[in-house]
Amino acid sequence: MANGNGTGAEVDAAPAINAMVQYTKDFSFENPNAPRSLGPQDKPPNIQIQVNVNAKQVAENDFEVNILLEGSAKTDADTLFKFELDYAGLFRLINIPQSDAHPVIMIECPRLLFPFARQIIADAVRSGGFPPLYIDPIDFAALYRQRMSQVAANEQAPTVA
């Protein structure tokens, strides 16, 4: 009989994600037109950011999850800066059914990593002489749905022999 305080077997069976370690796998920041690009600009730069999430299983319940962020800030004439960040974490899934593992890995794990990746980019852009770039929060659930729709569409597309 449970004692109502959330201890015992029911806690042991609770689903959980353990972030075992987080790390920068690869990072690049380029400031190709400094110091000329560091002066006042006539208008705000065009900022483009691409996001991708990858994961691979490294042990029975352990997964390495990567957020890949690539971006640039450009004016009509110049590139102000460019960056590429591959930020990863090693996650252990506990008591998560196999049927739920893929969305947990591709949505929840990146959601846990994102604030740290965002801060790395903000600090690098600031250190490059620009105001910090705070990337807007990313809807990893929408990104996951979009990716799954693309996979489904590719599987249904006829192949050319």
Swiss-Prot record:
Keyword list, A-Z: Chaperone, Cytoplasm, Protein transport, Translocation, Transport
GO cellular component terms, A-Z: cytoplasm
Alphabetical list of Gene3D superfamilies matching this protein: SecB-like
Example GO molecular function: unfolded protein binding
One Pfam assignment: SecB
Subunit structure: Homotetramer, a dimer of dimers. One homotetramer interacts with 1 SecA dimer.
Official protein name in the record: Protein-export protein SecB
Source organism of this protein record: Methylocella silvestris (strain DSM 15510 / CIP 108128 / LMG 27833 / NCIMB 13906 / BL2)
Gene designation: secB
